[in-house]
């Protein structure tokens, strides 16, 4: 399946608002997407006002993308925005001038006037903010990837299971109608057994953003450094590997791979080229490749 737009993001965001009890429907989608079990009634508490009161934590390009989408959802109200980088926070306030502003997400979470938060921060902040938000009694919609380390993912999973709150992660394909329909066909046996999976994602991009001063390099270009990023595997591959596991209806049992900095030799720490093979227990394999120095073959997910 080739994908060039992100309609699934908007659908996922709308489904998050639905899960808070503000929009009727969604039953058919729920039946075919079991990861949406976070919006079952036992995970919800009655909210006694007309709109879901949403706060944005992280208001860079991704956070502002969500702001624009939220403005199209009549049952959502942006009540607060938070960022510790002043230019991003100011841009968010220009988009939603009635929202309260914060530079410390912990202060935002103390507010009793917030039902849910949308987290669009660098990856290394996902786990602490998700955990703190659930502890504060907020519903959570978080950008991918779930977290930077496996231990952080496990901590989030355990905390969510002990909470009564909704938790979504923004994996676009999981909410995309094309992928949902395709998986229905695969799982029904219509096109036979899954015997192999191949995915690639090729781009021409250095991931580098301009910085106003050198001391902001690691803050603004966080995707390039290991303490804050998993590189191509967490920024791109996570989308496609999720599709593979969805198609196979299982998780791989082993993995081998390699990565290198082949082209962008500019001081970055994460690889700009990766090749990885995953193996399921039945011998079916995923062949995955990604690089950001040649976009000729674009992006594709193949279920064989």
Which sequence ranges carry the predicted segments?
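Conserved SAM-binding strand-loop segment of SAM-dependent methyltransferases
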Residues: 100-104
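Beta-strand-loop-alpha-helix segment that lines the small-molecule cofactor/substrate pocket
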Residues: 122-123, 127-175, 189
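N-terminal secretory signal peptides
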Residues: 1-15
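Predominantly a Rossmann-like dinucleotide-binding segment in NAD(P)-dependent oxidoreductases
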Residues: 58, 62, 162-169, 173-268, ...
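N-terminal Rossmann-like dinucleotide-binding module
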Residues: 20-96, 176, 244
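N-terminal Rossmann-like NAD(P) cofactor-binding module of classical short-chain dehydrogenase/reductase
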Residues: 117-118
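Glycine-centered tight beta-turn/hairpin loop motif at sheet-sheet or coil-to-beta transitions
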Residues: 281-285
């Amino acid at each position: 399946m080739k994908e060039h737009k992100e309609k699934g993001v908007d659908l996922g965001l709308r489904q998050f608002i639905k899960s808070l009890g503000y929009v009727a429907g969604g039953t058919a989608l729920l039946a075919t997407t079991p990861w949406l079990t976070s919006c079952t009634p036992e995970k919800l508490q009655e909210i006694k006002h007309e709109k879901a009161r949403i706060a944005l934590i992280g208001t860079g390009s991704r956070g502002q993308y969500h702001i624009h989408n939220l403005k199209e959802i009549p049952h959502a109200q942006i009540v607060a925005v938070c960022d510790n980088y002043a230019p991003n926070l100011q841009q968010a306030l220009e988009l939603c001038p009635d929202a309260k502003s914060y530079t410390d997400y912990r202060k935002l979470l103390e507010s009793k006037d917030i039902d849910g938060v949308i987290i669009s921060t660098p990856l290394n902040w996902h786990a602490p903010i998700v955990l703190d938000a659930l502890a504060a009694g907020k519903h959570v919609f978080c950008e991918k990837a779930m977290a930077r380390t496996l231990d952080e993912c496990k901590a989030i999973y355990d905390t969510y299971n002990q909470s009564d709150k909704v938790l979504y992660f923004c994996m676009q394909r999981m909410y995309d109608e094309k992928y949902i329909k395709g998986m229905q066909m695969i799982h029904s046996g219509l096109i036979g057994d899954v015997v192999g999976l191949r995915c690639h994602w090729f781009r021409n991009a250095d991931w580098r953003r301009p910085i106003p001063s050198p001391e902001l390099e690691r803050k603004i270009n966080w995707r390039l450094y290991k303490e804050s990023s998993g590189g191509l595997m967490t920024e791109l591959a996570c989308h496609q590997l999720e599709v593979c596991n969805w198609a196979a209806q299982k998780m791989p049992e082993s993995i081998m791979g390699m990565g290198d900095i082949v082209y962008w030799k500019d001081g970055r720490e994460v690889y700009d080229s990766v090749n990885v093979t995953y193996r399921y227990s039945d011998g079916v394999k995923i062949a995955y490749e990604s690089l950001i120095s040649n976009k000729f073959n674009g992006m594709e997910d193949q279920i064989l």
